[in-house]
């Protein structure tokens, strides 16, 4: 099913950065998230079959709404990537667990040619921000990623930035939970420089669609195992270190 994009009438033709926000029943969190999109950037809320009025609320708050009927985190993310037109594309969860204003230094690093793909390493803030089963699954995946690619990353979090052309060139195919991992694996295989920086991780609004239970977590791990089983492509690996992204940054 082809994604359908609807935009506010006042939206500019171009934006320096597009922020893809995969969304499934996140109406409660949307005001907080969209208020933190840096000024001048475009929010692409990808509605993945919400029944709580998320699409209508996002549109009322000035976001561009992309409808993707095929369920799946990867399907929503890729629909947003395909709808994006900016040179640099960011991704952020839509559940108020991550502040999109923290993407500003990520974008600056990509724009200045210091890295090709910048990831946020989640640092839990308060009890319940990152359940034990989700942390365990993430730790296991980080180890498998290191063995597969040589990248010494600590997290495969959803907060990230890269050039749109680089992401499209990766030919991403996963449409489920493996999409974020496949992006990193194929970036490493292609020799892209991958950086990881600390970001605060807040308790999310509502229940997780992926890692809210042990069953959901390990289903995601199985999805990602399939990604890691892909044969390596020719290329090199480059990973850089971490720093704590400044909080509250909202402009380039």
Predicted regions and their residues:
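Hydrophobic helical membrane-anchoring modules
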Residues: 1-13, 150, 172-252
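A conserved acidic beta->alpha catalytic loop
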Residues: 47-55, 96
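Donor nucleotide-sugar binding loop of glycosyltransferases
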Residues: 26-29, 50, 73, 99
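Short, well-formed alpha-helical segments that are part of the catalytic scaffolds
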Residues: 23-39
């Amino acid at each position: 099913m082809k994604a359908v994009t609807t935009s506010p009438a006042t939206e500019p033709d171009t934006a320096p950065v597009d922020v893809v926000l995969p969304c499934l029943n996140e109406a409660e969190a949307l005001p907080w998230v969209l208020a933190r999109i840096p000024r001048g950037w475009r929010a692409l809320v990808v509605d993945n079959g919400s029944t709580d009025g998320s699409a209508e609320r996002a549109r009322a708050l000035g976001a561009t709404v992309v409808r993707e009927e095929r369920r799946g985190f990867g399907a929503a993310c890729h629909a947003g990537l395909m709808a994006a037109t900016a040179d640099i594309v960011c991704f952020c969860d839509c559940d108020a667990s991550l502040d999109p204003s923290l993407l500003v230094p990520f974008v600056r690093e990509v724009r200045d040619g210091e890295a090709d793909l910048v990831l946020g390493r989640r640092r839990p803030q308060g009890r319940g921000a990152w359940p034990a089963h989700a942390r365990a699954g993430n730790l296991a995946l980080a180890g498998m990623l290191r063995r597969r690619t040589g990248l010494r990353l600590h997290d495969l979090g959803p907060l990230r930035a890269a050039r749109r052309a680089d992401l499209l060139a990766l030919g991403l195919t996963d449409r489920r939970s493996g999409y974020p991992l496949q992006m990193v694996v194929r970036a490493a295989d292609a020799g892209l420089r991958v950086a990881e920086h600390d970001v605060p991780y807040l308790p999310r609004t509502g229940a997780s669609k992926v890692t809210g239970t042990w069953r959901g977590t390990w289903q995601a791990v199985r999805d990602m195992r399939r990604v890691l089983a892909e044969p390596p492509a020719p290329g090199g690996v480059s990973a850089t270190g971490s720093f704590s992204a400044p909080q509250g940054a909202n402009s380039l």
